[in-house]
Amino acid sequence: MAVEIEGRITNINPEEVKAKLLAIGAKPLGFYNFRRYVFDPAIGAPHRWLRLRTDGNKTTLTFKELSNDSFSGTEEWEIEVSDFETTLEILEKTGIKHRSYQENTRDEYEYHGAKISIDHWPKLGYLLEIEVEKEEDIYDITSKLGFNPQDIVSANHADLYQNIGIDVNSCDVLKF
């Protein structure tokens, strides 16, 4: 199990942020087109979910549990699986039905051990996601990119969608 420590900045200009990342020495890791199925593992557990995700090359199965809304409020357990479609079929044959299908893109960078992503989500637009080992690194990196501390949110994607009037937990398909 790992605790995710991540912060987000919404409504960014992806080209400006990419230029700033390169200017501070961030290393490009790749551009990904993600497809995912999200499952509810238990009735009455809205803050727990299972995610099957692929970028076409790497496929992972991840269980996530949100304990609070802080930067470090999500725990995750993740394994790599070899076949996206077969894993989906196995999960559904056990009776676990997916609640939604989702797509997003990610332009990912590494900077002094931090994973920094420019994500694009349908109807949500572009956002910056920074995953670090220590919470204070979120503030350090965003400052170097020209953002203010009040620009940073710890909200998860479901909350960000809720802020624009979309209940992502009731949305069967979320794609471009």
Language-model segments: which ranges?
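N-terminal strand-loop-strand beta-hairpin
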Residues: 1-113, 148-176
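Strongly charged, low-complexity linkers/loops
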Residues: 115-121
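Secondary-structure transition motif
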Residues: 121-123, 133
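Short amphipathic alpha-helical "recognition" segments used for binding
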Residues: 10, 133-135
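Long, well-ordered alpha-helical scaffolding segments within enzyme catalytic domains
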Residues: 138-150
